Amino acid sequence: MKSTKSLKMEYKKIHLDLLKISKKNNHSSFLNFLKSSPPKQLKEFNGELSVYLSKTIVGQQLSTKAAKTIWERAEKFIIDHPLQNRNLENDLRESGLSQKKCEYVKNILISNTLQKKKNYYKTIGAEEFTNLLISYKGIGPWTVDMAKMFFLGDINILPKGDLGIKKACNNFFPNEDLDSIEEIYKPFNSYLSLNLWDSLD
């Protein structure tokens, strides 16, 4: 495991790499944004994959504020021995989740395959991880990308289906498509994504 100091140096170095890449490719608007912004950190979720996926599903198609409110209500039912909670679906419904989201979350929480230690998912390979996740209802490409970034800590993810990413890329790189941008900023696309999201705030 990397020390706090080495992690701090790593994200600062990546910020410098982004500056170099944007300058080399004449992305002046993005370069100016990077110069005026602090280095972004990619923070891994500290918990089980099933809990991370549940939290992500709770927040789907909701504003950040609404997602936070509902998660704060539902979290205790999801984390505190969900397998022993016979009233889990009812508890989730009362927390504000739709019927479909309740079903999705319950199926994720009762899956033994999603209860393994994080290192297991880091070693099975990206394709197998993707196939595992999308086999569950309620999980699509966007959720897989979020899990790769914020659960596994993959530094090279550009979630091309994300509306915010599309909007920010159109602002900074109006003459280039997402595939081209992804290739240009490889292998630091997750840090590119963090900056793109931040530019919309």
Question: What do these predicted ranges mean?
Answer:
Residues 1-124, 180-201:
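N-terminal polyanion-binding entry modules of DNA glycosylases/AP lyases
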Residues 62, 152, 173:
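Hydrophobic/aromatic-lined pockets within catalytic cores
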Residues 56, 131, 167, 179-180:
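Active-site phosphate/pyrophosphate- and oxyanion-stabilizing loops and adjacent acidic/basic residues
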